[in-house]
């Protein structure tokens, strides 16, 4: 069975791992980084994903998309989307009630759903794994915040399908991190472990009991909209005000300036985890004005005081739900890059009366590590280190339906172990009622209007009868991905209807997913074509400059002057052509190279046969991938 991979699809960074040779390997990307920015950029000539996209963001802010995880499975009118839009340089809009991200790609306006952007990041992670493993990969386990609701999980699964992945399972990030911790620690007797997972955009707290390879989640709580990005936002707002006060200039409307400031703030935040203060130095931030300033750790903590303190609320809630006292927690495990912030650690440690926090696992890689283990288990890995592991996860929110008077009647209570199936019998509210409308909600409030509507369906054809007579049996069934199926059957007639919750019209239809898969293949082919084009251009450039240097340098005395001038003149023509044709097609570069070789090769061969060739020249003429021998030297602009 080919290895399945585990992908941590993060708000700001993603990470991929694979279980092989009895252990998990976290895979580095082509830049040598073990985490990859969850960024996708669109330019006049190409699409960039990962480091390449993040590195050019200041030059191309409106067409560089990030934070797709803060959009996925949400509606346009969601308050969190509306507040985030103030901070994003790219445009978010709605088309036919569906949320879309607008960019300009190759000179044309394009619209993408959050699932499509996430699928591009997943494709990148898939390619990272494939180039490491040396073969195609199709099976994957993808992680989501434990507090993600049904629509967000379903949308993440769809993103996997668009990326050409067979999603074996969607698992919760803190649970994945607990696997990494449990395997690493070889936990023996029963231990209560609290996972505190504060990442770039989401926050989860889960309490698990780990004993002899059984990971049982007791409770989970969190905020799907709190993380490092929010701390950056506070700093950005602070400096925008400072800049306005100092120079009387508002940089809010200048997207490039705002992006450069955000990048500097992100860097400053990281520095403040190890230093008491740091400088921000941004040359020519706005209208030629330089911005040099200082921020102390104390000021950073003050700007985020409410957010930092707020991380303790889900900790208290998780303890209450697990019916545990804080003294019963054996280990507090930190996961996610934002747990490096000293103030966050101090608040948590103080809450647990000075108990030591566990920092033994890598906060950036633990989730992908656990996902890779779960992927190995699901694809039948027989290694004894993992085969006896059992994961018992829970539903993060209560699920139920609306009954008379808009009351929420929960069939599955939050923190119920999944997979689970619950059935309850309902009846009609009025005499001779011909049908019932089954409206499915998730949430903890008593009235459905305060909860989230997941979907609805009609069970019709109920024979006329007095109210309270018909018996309608409703079944809620949550699968191991945390995704819900609801069915209803009229016991009298045997009529039934069912629904896989498809998130009030926000969910992609089967046809849309198929179209997006086709689009993804098309973009991938375009990316490859662009890579081939650049490679052909580099090969021609490398050949022409090598040739020119050789005949003007070490071969100068060995070639007849007339031949030398022929080569120089042809090289200069080619260089002039290259200056004008920066975006020619692959075949044009190749035919130019052939033309050049036709002129140069016979002259060089004559010198070579006469024994005048310096060592290695013959090889060098093929630098840039032309000769097929030795490594390709790629020039970097």
From Swiss-Prot:
GO terms for molecular function: ATP binding; ATP-dependent protein folding chaperone. InterPro entries: ATPase_NBD, Heat_shock_70_CS, HSP70_C_sf, HSP70_peptide-bd_sf, Hsp_70_fam. Pfam families: HSP70. It comes from the Eukaryota. Gene3D superfamilies: 1.20.1270.10, 3.30.30.30, 3.30.420.40, Actin, Chain A, domain 4, Substrate Binding Domain Of DNAk, Chain A, domain 1. Keywords: ATP-binding, Nucleotide-binding, Stress response. Residues 615-637 are annotated as: Disordered. CDD domains: ASKHA_NBD_HSP70_HSPA1. Major immunogen in Schistosoma mansoni infections. Possibly plays an important role in parasite development and pathogenesis. Belongs to the heat shock protein 70 family. PANTHER family: HEAT SHOCK PROTEIN 70KDA (PTHR19375). This is Heat shock 70 kDa protein homolog. It comes from Schistosoma mansoni.
């Amino acid at each position: 069975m080919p290895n399945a991979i585990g992908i941590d699809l993060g708000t700001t960074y993603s990470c991929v791992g694979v279980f092989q040779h009895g252990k998990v390997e976290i895979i580095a990307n082509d830049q040598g980084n073990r985490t990859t920015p969850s960024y996708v950029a669109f330019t006049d000539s190409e699409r960039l994903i990962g480091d390449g996209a993040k590195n050019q963001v200041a030059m191309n802010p409106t067409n560089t998309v990030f934070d797709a995880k803060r959009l996925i499975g949400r509606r346009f009118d969601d308050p969190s989307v509306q507040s985030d839009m103030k901070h994003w340089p790219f445009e978010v809009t709605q088309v036919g009630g569906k949320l879309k991200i607008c960019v300009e790609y190759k000179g044309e306006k394009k619209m993408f759903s959050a699932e499509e952007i996430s699928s591009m990041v997943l494709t990148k992670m898939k390619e990272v794994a494939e180039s490491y493993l040396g073969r195609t990969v199709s099976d994957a386990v993808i992680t989501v915040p434990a507090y993600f609701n049904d629509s967000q999980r379903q949308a993440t699964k769809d993103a996997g399908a668009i990326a050409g992945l067979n999603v074996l399972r969607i698992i919760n990030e803190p649970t994945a991190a607990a696997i990494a911790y449990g395997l690493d620690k070889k936990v023996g007797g029963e231990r209560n472990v609290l996972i505190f997972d504060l990442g770039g955009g989401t926050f989860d707290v889960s309490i698990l009991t780990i004993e002899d390879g059984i990971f049982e989640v007791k409770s989970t709580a969190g905020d799907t909209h709190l993380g490092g990005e929010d701390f950056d936002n506070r700093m950005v707002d602070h400096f925008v005000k400072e800049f306005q006060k100092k120079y009387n200039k508002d940089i809010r409307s200048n997207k490039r300036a705002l992006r450069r400031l955000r990048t500097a703030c992100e860097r400053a935040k990281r520095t403040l985890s190890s230093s008491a203060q740091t400088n921000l130095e941004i040359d020519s931030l706005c209208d030629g004005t330089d911005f040099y300033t200082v921020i102390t750790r104390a000021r950073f903590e003050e700007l985020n005081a409410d957010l930092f303190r707020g991380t303790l609320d889900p900790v208290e809630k998780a303890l209450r739900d697990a019916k545990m006292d804080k003294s019963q927690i054996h280990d507090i495990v930190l996961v996610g890059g934002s747990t490096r912030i000293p103030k966050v650690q101090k608040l948590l440690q103080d809450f647990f009366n000075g108990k030591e926090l566990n920092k033994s696992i890598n906060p950036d890689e633990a989730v992908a590590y656990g996902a890779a283990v779960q992927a190995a288990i699901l694809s039948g890995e027989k290694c004894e280190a993992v085969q006896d592991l059992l994961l018992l996860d829970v539903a993060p929110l209560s699920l139920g339906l609306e009954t008379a008077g808009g009351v929420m009647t929960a069939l599955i209570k939050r923190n119920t172990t999944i997979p689970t199936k619950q059935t309850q019998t309902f009846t009609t509210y009025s005499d001779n009622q011909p049908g019932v409308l089954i409206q499915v909600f998730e949430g903890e409030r008593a009235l459905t209007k305060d909860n989230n509507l997941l979907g609805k369906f009609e069970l019709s054809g109920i024979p006329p009868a007095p109210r309270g007579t018909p018996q309608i049996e409703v079944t809620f069934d949550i699968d191991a991905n945390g995704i819900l199926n609801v069915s209803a059957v009229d016991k009298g007639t045997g009529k039934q209807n069912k629904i896989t919750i498809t998130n009030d019209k926000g969910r992609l239809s089967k046809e849309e997913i198929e179209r997006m898969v086709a689009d993804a293949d098309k973009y991938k082919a375009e990316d490859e074509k662009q890579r081939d084009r650049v490679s052909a251009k580099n090969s021609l450039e490398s050949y022409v400059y090598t040739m020119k240097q050789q005949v003007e340098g070490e071969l100068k005395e060995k070639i007849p002057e007339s031949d030398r001038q022929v080569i120089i003149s042809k090289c200069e023509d080619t260089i002039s052509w290259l200056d004008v044709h920066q975006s020619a097609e692959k075949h044009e570069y190749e035919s130019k190279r052939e033309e050049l070789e036709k002129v140069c090769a016979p002259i060089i061969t004559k010198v070579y046969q006469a024994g005048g060739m310096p060592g290695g020249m013959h090889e060098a003429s093929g630098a840039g991938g032309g000769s097929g021998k030795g490594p390709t030297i790629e020039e970097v602009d």
